[in-house]
């Protein structure tokens, strides 16, 4: 059971949320007094409480979601809060639904969405994974961070062929290596205020690192927001090649490292927005004509469940009519379906852009 000091902090946090009338987070929407009273004294076997779940959203009242899972068990123990938030964010994934088993499908059915190279600047597909037997960031000890890094770096070092590369630990990284990784847009920084408030950046930079292959088309972030972020990317629009590289990497890593998986929610991640397939397939794409007709762009994107962001990701503007467009759905569908929906949507956007000449 949570101790008195934690419950006192929780009570104060709940009051703060109640008083914040302009707060629009899903946390505020679903943390009713009834749910709060049911969960406030619960504690996972690794010692995580409701405070670990909600503290980022209490601290940052402008959060969109406002909750994180401190460990895998939190998704079950604090389900009365997580489940409605998951249903709201992952539209259509009801509390009675079960996420399907992993299925990359026929990876050869994916194509180059822009063979002429006129529209798509680059293509990227990523997924997140958590290692079984370890909690998520807020509950990890420094020695666990180091132990995980050792397991992951030895696994990655055994990769062969196109995936063969180098692991760079953030601890003791030289200025030259740091600059090189920044120039390649590979280096991740210490977490933003949302992650900081969730206690996701403790013992930084212990256990954190970056692996990339020699061609710079395959990248793994170790212990950033999730235990593993596995990323495949390249210039141009060859989604097929990018997806095939990702799936072969995930399959290789999975042989050596067991991942946290939940019967109902799929692959588990620190943030509930990434659950399920955890897959985000995106392109940087130039659509000057559609950019001038934002309504049409949003209409087509909506039809294919695509998310349209600015050039540099969330909360940024489109520079020179270049957008970051990705699949929005992660839950209740397979990896194959998520990427296929994105491919169909991008092909449709390019077709419309061409017709607008």
Curated annotation (Swiss-Prot):
It comes from Metapenaeus ensis. Residues 9-91 form the Phosphagen kinase N-terminal domain. It comes from the Eukaryota. Keywords: Allergen, ATP-binding, Kinase, Nucleotide-binding, Transferase. Belongs to the ATP:guanido phosphotransferase family. This is Arginine kinase Met e 2. Optimum temperature is 30 degrees Celsius. One of its GO terms (biological process) is female gonad development. It is an enzyme of class 2 (transferase). Catalyzes the reversible transfer of high energy ATP gamma-phosphate group to L-arginine. One of its GO terms (molecular function) is ATP binding. One of its GO terms (cellular component) is extracellular space.
